[in-house]
Amino acid sequence: MNQVNFLNLDKNILIITSGGDAPGMNASLISLIHRLMNNNFNVFIGIEGLLGLYNNLIEPIKDKRVFDVYFNEQGTVIKTSRFIKLDINDKKTQIIKDNLLSHNIQKIIILGGQGSMQAGLVLTKMGFEVFGILHTIDNDFSETQMCIGALSAASFNQKLLKCLNYTAKAHCAFNLVELMGRECSWLVNNSVGKLKPILMLTNQDNKYTVDEVIDLIKDKINSIKEYDPLIIVQELIYDQKWYELLVKTFEQKLHKSLRITILNYLQRGAPVSDFDLQLAKDSANVLVDFIVNQNDIKNTNNMYVVINKFDNKLEVIKFNK
């Protein structure tokens, strides 16, 4: 598309997807585009997240239906990226500011997780009005009950773990499966479903040595009548060398085969659940209504983020930490 500059700053708004992708980003994006354009906003998109803003990959949306076919699709049609931590004194951050202002953009909506929200907070300190909708499979925001994408990933993991359980049993073997979650154990705990793993290791537990894990499994084999031959581990606790030593020691002391499966990006590409599709649509509507009805929030050094409480009621709160 050709670059188009609109003069009305109050009606120009940009949307980016940022950081790790999460199922439901497309649904949020498309819902936002429709709701914003129905309210006479000039909508821009940033291609490839913050990296795209740095590279001035900013384009206007001319047809609100342009991405409709991707509504149910995982990933993000406008792409995303990892980028440096923004800092108002950093040259690259200043370039992002200059690029946004060159398009007469003052309002920004960020779809992403923890790091993306922190980046948005930096942009508010540079004079921009920034809003966010939480998308992360880690579900690691204490302010909200559910982040978009988390339930999709957990549901998909349940299916994958069930498959791995079948094949492990078929070979009288055990399977250690590493799941994502970063510093939050929500995804691990909600990926198990009805399975009964012989052991689960999260960052809420002690960090065990290989011999300690072997002893734990021995005790459980002797004390538990029913279990599934799965060891579920949260990421960023143990490294590859630890896993390799565990495999070797497992065979030596338990006389069983241990397989290592790291699900990694399979979780990010999970099919989008009906729950996340609806949450994405509802969050977009609530945020746009907030933007339309709040004309006194300019340059407050606060970012505004959509959250849902335990009664699933959506609201917009200040995010300033």
Swiss-Prot record:
Keywords of the record: ATP-binding, Cytoplasm, Glycolysis, Kinase, Magnesium, Metal-binding, Nucleotide-binding, Transferase
Identification of the protein by name: Probable ATP-dependent 6-phosphofructokinase
GO BP annotations, alphabetical order: canonical glycolysis; fructose 1,6-bisphosphate metabolic process; fructose 6-phosphate metabolic process
Oligomer and partners: Homotetramer.
Function summary: Catalyzes the phosphorylation of D-fructose 6-phosphate to fructose 1,6-bisphosphate by ATP, the first committing step of glycolysis.
Pathway it works in: Carbohydrate degradation; glycolysis; D-glyceraldehyde 3-phosphate and glycerone phosphate from D-glucose: step 3/4
Reactions mediated catalytically: beta-D-fructose 6-phosphate + ATP = beta-D-fructose 1,6-bisphosphate + ADP + H(+)
Residues noted as binding ATP in the record, renumbered to the chain: 20, 82-83
UniProt main location, coarse: cytoplasm
Enzyme class: transferase
Active site per UniProt: 138 (proton acceptor)
Localization terms from the record: Cytoplasm
Annotated organism of origin: Ureaplasma parvum serovar 3 (strain ATCC 700970)
Lineage: Bacteria, Bacillati, Mycoplasmatota, Mycoplasmoidales, Mycoplasmoidaceae
Family: Belongs to the phosphofructokinase type A (PFKA) family.
